[in-house]
Design a protein with these regions (language model features):
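Well-ordered beta-strand segments characteristic of repetitive beta-sheet solenoids
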Residues: 1, 8, 12-19, 33-40, ...
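Short, T/G/N/S-enriched strand-turn elements that build extracellular solenoid repeat scaffolds
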Residues: 3-8, 24-30, 45-51, 66-72, ...
Length: 243
Protein backbone atom coordinates (compact mmCIF):
# COMPACT_ATOMS: atom_id res chain seq x y z
CA UNK A 1 0.00 0.00 0.00
CA UNK A 2 1.66 3.19 -1.26
CA UNK A 3 -1.35 5.50 -1.24
CA UNK A 4 -1.69 9.19 -0.41
CA UNK A 5 1.71 10.69 -1.13
CA UNK A 6 3.59 7.47 -0.44
CA UNK A 7 7.01 7.24 -2.14
CA UNK A 8 8.97 4.21 -3.30
CA UNK A 9 12.23 5.26 -4.94
CA UNK A 10 15.46 3.63 -6.05
CA UNK A 11 18.62 5.36 -7.23
CA UNK A 12 19.28 2.44 -9.55
CA UNK A 13 16.90 -0.32 -10.65
CA UNK A 14 13.54 -0.38 -8.88
CA UNK A 15 11.82 -3.78 -8.77
CA UNK A 16 8.38 -4.18 -7.19
CA UNK A 17 6.97 -7.72 -7.15
CA UNK A 18 3.92 -8.93 -5.26
CA UNK A 19 1.43 -11.76 -5.64
CA UNK A 20 -1.25 -9.40 -4.41
CA UNK A 21 -2.31 -5.90 -5.41
CA UNK A 22 -0.22 -2.73 -5.50
CA UNK A 23 -2.22 0.32 -4.42
CA UNK A 24 -0.49 3.49 -5.59
CA UNK A 25 -3.43 5.89 -5.58
CA UNK A 26 -1.91 9.34 -5.18
CA UNK A 27 1.51 7.78 -4.55
CA UNK A 28 4.82 7.61 -6.42
CA UNK A 29 6.97 4.69 -7.54
CA UNK A 30 10.21 5.97 -9.08
CA UNK A 31 13.14 4.18 -10.68
CA UNK A 32 15.99 6.54 -11.44
CA UNK A 33 17.49 3.97 -13.81
CA UNK A 34 14.85 1.30 -14.49
CA UNK A 35 11.45 0.30 -13.14
CA UNK A 36 9.92 -3.17 -13.11
CA UNK A 37 6.50 -3.96 -11.61
CA UNK A 38 4.76 -7.33 -11.33
CA UNK A 39 1.49 -7.63 -9.43
CA UNK A 40 -2.00 -9.10 -9.60
CA UNK A 41 -3.42 -5.60 -9.92
CA UNK A 42 -1.99 -2.09 -10.00
CA UNK A 43 -4.20 0.79 -8.88
CA UNK A 44 -2.57 4.02 -10.01
CA UNK A 45 -5.62 6.27 -9.96
CA UNK A 46 -5.98 9.73 -8.46
CA UNK A 47 -2.75 11.19 -9.88
CA UNK A 48 -0.65 8.17 -8.97
CA UNK A 49 2.78 8.20 -10.66
CA UNK A 50 5.08 5.48 -11.92
CA UNK A 51 8.20 6.92 -13.52
CA UNK A 52 11.58 5.81 -14.77
CA UNK A 53 14.63 7.53 -16.22
CA UNK A 54 15.31 4.28 -18.06
CA UNK A 55 13.13 1.39 -19.23
CA UNK A 56 9.78 0.55 -17.66
CA UNK A 57 8.33 -2.99 -17.58
CA UNK A 58 4.89 -3.54 -16.08
CA UNK A 59 3.16 -6.92 -16.01
CA UNK A 60 -0.15 -7.13 -14.15
CA UNK A 61 -3.57 -8.71 -14.56
CA UNK A 62 -5.40 -5.40 -14.07
CA UNK A 63 -4.02 -1.90 -14.44
CA UNK A 64 -6.15 1.09 -13.43
CA UNK A 65 -4.39 4.28 -14.49
CA UNK A 66 -7.54 6.40 -14.71
CA UNK A 67 -8.41 9.73 -13.10
CA UNK A 68 -5.08 11.43 -13.70
CA UNK A 69 -2.78 8.43 -13.27
CA UNK A 70 0.62 8.71 -14.99
CA UNK A 71 3.09 6.15 -16.34
CA UNK A 72 6.17 7.99 -17.59
CA UNK A 73 9.39 6.52 -18.96
CA UNK A 74 12.26 8.30 -20.68
CA UNK A 75 13.17 5.13 -22.56
CA UNK A 76 11.35 1.94 -23.62
CA UNK A 77 8.06 0.93 -22.02
CA UNK A 78 6.62 -2.59 -22.07
CA UNK A 79 3.15 -3.00 -20.58
CA UNK A 80 1.24 -6.28 -20.34
CA UNK A 81 -2.17 -6.49 -18.68
CA UNK A 82 -5.38 -8.42 -19.08
CA UNK A 83 -7.29 -5.17 -18.68
CA UNK A 84 -5.90 -1.63 -19.01
CA UNK A 85 -8.01 1.32 -17.85
CA UNK A 86 -6.43 4.61 -18.90
CA UNK A 87 -9.52 6.83 -18.85
CA UNK A 88 -8.27 10.39 -18.37
CA UNK A 89 -4.82 8.95 -17.65
CA UNK A 90 -1.42 9.34 -19.33
CA UNK A 91 1.09 6.78 -20.58
CA UNK A 92 4.21 8.42 -22.02
CA UNK A 93 7.43 6.87 -23.34
CA UNK A 94 10.60 8.47 -24.67
CA UNK A 95 11.37 5.41 -26.80
CA UNK A 96 9.31 2.46 -28.06
CA UNK A 97 6.01 1.84 -26.27
CA UNK A 98 4.57 -1.68 -26.45
CA UNK A 99 1.08 -2.33 -25.03
CA UNK A 100 -0.49 -5.78 -24.92
CA UNK A 101 -3.88 -6.37 -23.30
CA UNK A 102 -7.25 -8.05 -23.72
CA UNK A 103 -9.11 -4.77 -23.24
CA UNK A 104 -7.68 -1.25 -23.50
CA UNK A 105 -9.90 1.64 -22.38
CA UNK A 106 -8.32 4.97 -23.31
CA UNK A 107 -11.40 7.17 -23.27
CA UNK A 108 -10.21 10.78 -22.85
CA UNK A 109 -6.76 9.31 -22.15
CA UNK A 110 -3.34 9.99 -23.65
CA UNK A 111 -0.94 7.29 -24.87
CA UNK A 112 2.14 8.62 -26.63
CA UNK A 113 5.76 8.06 -27.56
CA UNK A 114 8.37 10.17 -29.31
CA UNK A 115 9.33 6.87 -30.95
CA UNK A 116 7.01 3.99 -31.97
CA UNK A 117 3.78 2.78 -30.38
CA UNK A 118 2.62 -0.82 -30.84
CA UNK A 119 -0.76 -1.57 -29.26
CA UNK A 120 -2.45 -4.96 -29.28
CA UNK A 121 -5.89 -5.45 -27.70
CA UNK A 122 -7.23 -8.98 -28.07
CA UNK A 123 -10.90 -7.94 -27.71
CA UNK A 124 -11.31 -4.16 -27.92
CA UNK A 125 -9.46 -0.85 -27.91
CA UNK A 126 -11.69 2.05 -26.87
CA UNK A 127 -10.16 5.42 -27.75
CA UNK A 128 -13.30 7.56 -27.76
CA UNK A 129 -12.19 11.10 -27.04
CA UNK A 130 -8.64 9.87 -26.44
CA UNK A 131 -5.28 10.22 -28.17
CA UNK A 132 -2.77 7.58 -29.22
CA UNK A 133 0.33 9.08 -30.85
CA UNK A 134 3.51 7.38 -32.05
CA UNK A 135 5.85 9.91 -33.64
CA UNK A 136 7.98 7.25 -35.37
CA UNK A 137 5.13 4.89 -36.15
CA UNK A 138 1.80 3.64 -34.82
CA UNK A 139 0.77 0.00 -35.17
CA UNK A 140 -2.58 -1.16 -33.76
CA UNK A 141 -4.09 -4.64 -33.84
CA UNK A 142 -7.52 -5.35 -32.34
CA UNK A 143 -10.83 -6.92 -33.39
CA UNK A 144 -12.86 -3.85 -32.37
CA UNK A 145 -11.49 -0.30 -32.63
CA UNK A 146 -13.58 2.57 -31.21
CA UNK A 147 -12.30 6.04 -32.13
CA UNK A 148 -15.44 8.18 -32.08
CA UNK A 149 -16.04 11.45 -30.24
CA UNK A 150 -12.95 13.18 -31.65
CA UNK A 151 -10.62 10.30 -30.86
CA UNK A 152 -7.16 10.69 -32.42
CA UNK A 153 -4.76 8.08 -33.83
CA UNK A 154 -1.70 9.85 -35.19
CA UNK A 155 1.88 9.42 -36.34
CA UNK A 156 4.50 11.50 -38.11
CA UNK A 157 5.64 8.25 -39.68
CA UNK A 158 3.42 5.39 -40.84
CA UNK A 159 0.11 4.39 -39.25
CA UNK A 160 -1.14 0.80 -39.57
CA UNK A 161 -4.43 -0.46 -38.20
CA UNK A 162 -5.55 -4.08 -38.47
CA UNK A 163 -9.00 -4.82 -37.06
CA UNK A 164 -12.34 -6.45 -37.66
CA UNK A 165 -14.33 -3.25 -37.12
CA UNK A 166 -13.41 0.43 -36.99
CA UNK A 167 -15.82 3.04 -35.63
CA UNK A 168 -14.42 6.50 -36.40
CA UNK A 169 -17.55 8.67 -36.45
CA UNK A 170 -18.27 11.87 -34.58
CA UNK A 171 -15.07 13.64 -35.51
CA UNK A 172 -12.69 10.70 -35.11
CA UNK A 173 -9.31 11.25 -36.80
CA UNK A 174 -6.55 9.04 -38.19
CA UNK A 175 -3.57 11.16 -39.25
CA UNK A 176 -0.10 10.47 -40.63
CA UNK A 177 2.66 12.41 -42.37
CA UNK A 178 3.91 9.30 -44.24
CA UNK A 179 1.05 6.90 -44.90
CA UNK A 180 -2.01 5.14 -43.49
CA UNK A 181 -2.90 1.48 -44.00
CA UNK A 182 -6.28 0.35 -42.63
CA UNK A 183 -7.19 -3.31 -43.09
CA UNK A 184 -10.60 -4.40 -41.79
CA UNK A 185 -12.30 -7.78 -42.04
CA UNK A 186 -15.64 -6.17 -41.24
CA UNK A 187 -17.29 -2.76 -41.11
CA UNK A 188 -15.78 0.72 -41.31
CA UNK A 189 -18.03 3.45 -39.89
CA UNK A 190 -16.53 6.83 -40.78
CA UNK A 191 -19.64 9.00 -40.48
CA UNK A 192 -18.35 12.54 -39.93
CA UNK A 193 -14.88 11.09 -39.34
CA UNK A 194 -11.57 11.77 -41.11
CA UNK A 195 -8.54 9.91 -42.40
CA UNK A 196 -5.83 12.38 -43.40
CA UNK A 197 -2.50 11.26 -44.85
CA UNK A 198 0.33 13.35 -46.25
CA UNK A 199 1.49 10.15 -47.97
CA UNK A 200 -0.53 7.18 -49.23
CA UNK A 201 -3.88 6.05 -47.86
CA UNK A 202 -5.09 2.46 -48.23
CA UNK A 203 -8.44 1.31 -46.85
CA UNK A 204 -9.83 -2.23 -47.10
CA UNK A 205 -13.13 -3.20 -45.47
CA UNK A 206 -16.17 -5.42 -45.85
CA UNK A 207 -18.34 -2.32 -46.12
CA UNK A 208 -17.77 1.40 -45.71
CA UNK A 209 -20.09 4.10 -44.41
CA UNK A 210 -18.49 7.47 -45.18
CA UNK A 211 -21.54 9.70 -44.81
CA UNK A 212 -20.21 13.17 -44.10
CA UNK A 213 -16.74 11.69 -43.70
CA UNK A 214 -13.41 12.41 -45.38
CA UNK A 215 -10.72 10.14 -46.79
CA UNK A 216 -7.87 12.29 -48.10
CA UNK A 217 -4.24 11.82 -49.07
CA UNK A 218 -1.41 13.69 -50.71
CA UNK A 219 -0.26 10.39 -52.21
CA UNK A 220 -2.20 7.54 -53.77
CA UNK A 221 -5.62 6.74 -52.33
CA UNK A 222 -6.91 3.17 -52.63
CA UNK A 223 -10.31 2.22 -51.21
CA UNK A 224 -11.60 -1.35 -51.40
CA UNK A 225 -15.03 -2.30 -50.05
CA UNK A 226 -16.33 -5.83 -50.57
CA UNK A 227 -19.89 -4.71 -49.88
CA UNK A 228 -21.73 -1.40 -49.88
CA UNK A 229 -19.97 1.95 -49.94
CA UNK A 230 -22.10 4.85 -48.72
CA UNK A 231 -20.43 8.17 -49.49
CA UNK A 232 -23.45 10.45 -49.15
CA UNK A 233 -22.12 13.89 -48.23
CA UNK A 234 -18.67 12.35 -47.93
CA UNK A 235 -15.37 13.15 -49.61
CA UNK A 236 -12.69 10.97 -51.21
CA UNK A 237 -9.73 13.11 -52.27
CA UNK A 238 -6.19 12.46 -53.48
CA UNK A 239 -3.48 14.61 -55.00
CA UNK A 240 -1.96 11.59 -56.74
CA UNK A 241 -4.75 9.37 -58.00
CA UNK A 242 -7.76 7.48 -56.69
CA UNK A 243 -8.50 3.78 -57.12
Amino acid sequence: DNRQDGLLQSRDRAVVKTRGDLDNRGGQVVGLNELQVQAAALDNRSAGLLSSKGDMDIEVARLDNSAGGKLVSERRTLLKADRLDNRSGRIVAGQDLDLSSRLIDNRAGDISSTSRVVASAREQLDNRGGKIVGDSGLDITTPRMLNQDKGVLASRDGLRLSATELFNGGGGLLSSQKGIDVSLAGAFDNQAGSLDSRGFLTVKSAWLDNQGGTLSSAGALAVTSQGALNNQGGRLASDAGLS
